[in-house]
Amino acid sequence: MKHRYLPATDQDKKEMLEAIGVERIDELFSDIPESVRFKGEYQIKKAKSETELTKELTKLAAKNKDTVTYASFLGAGVYDHYQPVIVDHVISRSEFYTAYTPYQPEISQGELQAIFEFQTMICELTGMDISNSSMYDGGTALAEAAMLASGHTKKKKIVVSETVHPESREVLKTYAKGQYIDVVEVPSKNGTADLEALDEAVCEDTAAVIVQYPNFFGRIEPLKDIKPIAHKGKSMFIVSANPLALGLLTPPGALGADIVVGDAQPFGIPAAFGGPHCGFFAVTKKLMRKVPGRLVGQTEDENGKRGFVLTLQAREQHIRRDKATSNICSNQALNALAASVAMTALGKKGVKEIAWQNLQKAAYAKEAAKRAGLEVAFEGPMFNEFVIRLNEPVEKANERLLEKNIIGGYDLGASYPDLKRHMLIAVTELRTKEEIDTLMNELGDCHE
């Protein structure tokens, strides 16, 4: 009789060994030398009851620093934003929560329409023609954009500003290495891309130029000035954008971008130790057939009713296998749904209002930093992040801030050696005047 819970009872093991003609399990490992085999018992704790285990895990989880008890000024790609209550209610519905790739449209209309709405909203924010159903995160979306550009132009050089998120650049390099693509990083000047250096780096062999908007330091890159440089030599212009900032800023599509990517985390997706997230990928119409990931299209059924289907599937690996131009398997559809619900709940006015609050509160925080005697590293247009210079290591300052129930900013010295003792501060709509003043006063006291 098979046991309901144990995967391999003694009887199961006996039957399997007899079937393969082996007497003992040890014989299966005869190829492994005795000298390197592990012998003895694993140091595993004794089994606990459910109540004991729950208490232990609750105690362990209490050690985490959350953004409810603590005021978070940590951004650098993952932000503490308001999540409409309705988001969790919708994504927890079983038909969404357990849904996989909707290959059969006749039984997946709800899922397909939700993805279609996500694509529509991303196009509205970015000013682009086509959006896919989602990517894994902002970093992989950026790397996939570079691969698309290289394949489309048949060129093997990618020029990227060092003001692009350092982790996204690392993902890009990982992708590029396997494709023998050369990644050239261009230095910054006063917190934005150095346009002269960018112009010098772009040549006839350049497949694409990549910038971030707003960039990693919080500054607004001059896309209008970068566009002619990026398109020099028929290379492509890729912009990695914060979707919330696009509630206020001119869309990259209106400024000449060929591909716009980013991470939808600001909309309805919690920080959650860095993931999972939801990348987005939007392009001009001419690149539609080269977009990675799934595309949901609108159509009509035989009765003339509106319906939704996976379209242009010939690009994908379940159709073309090794010749596919898209190799995204199970995408982030659930997180895309969360982002869609959040954007819908906020509406156009709500997205703009939250973006405006981010801008205003960050501007107030920057002035508060100056009043506290702190030096702001880069002056100029910004969104919700800026950089200050400290007289002490950022790590030390952040340890002290934790005692005041504040999660401090990102240590830029970890990614930029010339910016040691520089802190990247993020200010979202959730931060209060009192929290901002407390942060700056604490940092200012140690700056004197």
Curated annotation (Swiss-Prot):
Gene Ontology molecular function terms on file: glycine dehydrogenase (decarboxylating) activity
Pfam family, one: GDC-P
Enzyme Commission no: 1.4.4.2
Keywords recorded for this protein, A-Z: Oxidoreductase
InterPro entries: GcvPA, GDC-P_N, GDC_P, PyrdxlP-dep_Trfase, PyrdxlP-dep_Trfase_major, PyrdxlP-dep_Trfase_small
GO biological-process terms attached to the record: glycine decarboxylation via glycine cleavage system; nucleoside metabolic process
Cell membrane among keywords: no
Assembly and interaction partners: The glycine cleavage system is composed of four proteins: P, T, L and H. In this organism, the P 'protein' is a heterodimer of two subunits.
Similarity comment: family membership: Belongs to the GcvP family. N-terminal subunit subfamily.
Function: The glycine cleavage system catalyzes the degradation of glycine. The P protein binds the alpha-amino group of glycine through its pyridoxal phosphate cofactor; CO(2) is released and the remaining methylamine moiety is then transferred to the lipoamide cofactor of the H protein.
NCBIfam families with a match to the protein in the record: PRK00451.1
Protein name (database record): Probable glycine dehydrogenase (decarboxylating) subunit 1
Native source species: Bacillus licheniformis (strain ATCC 14580 / DSM 13 / JCM 2505 / CCUG 7422 / NBRC 12200 / NCIMB 9375 / NCTC 10341 / NRRL NRS-1264 / Gibson 46)
